[in-house]
């Protein structure tokens, strides 16, 4: 675990491998929540006691939440700085990655966007909602609390509760559009941007569909990216998609983990693998020197 890495680094006779993973966790904004028996949206109205089902369809709300996430503090306090803070789902290590702008932590900008949201009704009426994370995941729990506390600090009429849900139930509920914000990760099935950008952005993607996010231009680009074999054309496509991730304020990519492996310095032959860090520990390929 990251808190113990400095202690391990101080030990003599060890070789450490820091391996950024081809995986990313994000907080997704659902733009059409299922209201049936749903406590996560309160009254289901913008009346101070809930949020409407399409609360996050207003880009001003999404931008407000993005500006309320303190990436630098999160990186230091949760990961001891040993993490990659991604700017889009096309994380470092994947082809055609580029750093796109992020919504830096700025509570004034967050408040300004909240004042614009829903023609000023969000700021005047206030709202109440619940953010959930899966039980036992401290990294996602910390992200949920950071969003909740910073948004609530903007206006006493903003009320957000954080709850944990068992993993098996979490999966069922986010797939039934029960969460206005759901926090979940994705690991590479194969090391290509399509596996991430389609998953996160396409209206039929594994996560895109459960955000109820639909953008014909995004769908077209996602489909063109996998259908094309020309590297230059693919680069252009995926650069556009990464730009759209920012301008559309689709969701909040929170972290790309770095796994640390420690071996005695006389152990040789370990080759880090960004997809299969643990499974790649092939004993037949490791030797003592």
Please place each PLM-identified region on the residue numbering.
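Long beta-strand-rich cores associated with HINT superfamily self-processing modules
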Residues: 261-289
């Amino acid at each position: 675990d990251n808190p113990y890495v400095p202690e391990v680094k101080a030990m003599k006779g060890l070789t450490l491998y820091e391996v950024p993973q081809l995986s990313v966790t994000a907080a997704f904004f659902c733009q059409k929540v299922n209201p049936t028996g749903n406590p996560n949206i309160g009254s289901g109205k913008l009346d101070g006691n809930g949020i409407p089902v399409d609360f996050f369809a207003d880009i001003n709300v999404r931008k407000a939440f993005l500006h309320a996430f303190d990436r630098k503090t999160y990186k230091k306090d949760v990961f001891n700085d040993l993490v990659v803070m991604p700017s889009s789902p096309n994380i470092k290590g994947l082809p055609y990655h580029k750093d796109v702008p992020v919504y830096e932590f700025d509570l004034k900008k967050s408040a300004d966007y909240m004042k614009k949201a829903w023609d000023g009704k969000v700021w005047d009426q206030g709202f109440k909602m619940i953010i959930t994370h899966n039980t036992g995941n401290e990294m996602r729990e910390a992200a949920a609390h950071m969003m909740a506390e910073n948004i609530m600090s903007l206006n006493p009429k903003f009320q957000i509760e954080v709850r944990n849900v068992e993993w098996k139930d979490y999966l069922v509920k986010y797939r039934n559009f029960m969460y206005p914000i759901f926090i979940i990760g994705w690991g590479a099935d194969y090391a290509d941007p399509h596996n991430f950008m389609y998953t996160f952005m396409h209206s039929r993607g594994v996560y895109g569909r459960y955000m109820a996010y639909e953008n014909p231009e995004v769908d077209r680009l996602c489909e063109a990216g996998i259908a094309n074999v020309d590297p230059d054309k693919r680069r252009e496509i995926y650069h556009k998609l990464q730009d759209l991730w920012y301008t559309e304020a689709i969701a909040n990519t929170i972290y790309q983990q770095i796994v640390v492996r420690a071996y005695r310095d006389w152990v040789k032959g370990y080759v880090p693998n960004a997809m299969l860090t643990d499974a790649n520990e092939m004993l037949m390929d490791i030797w003592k020197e």
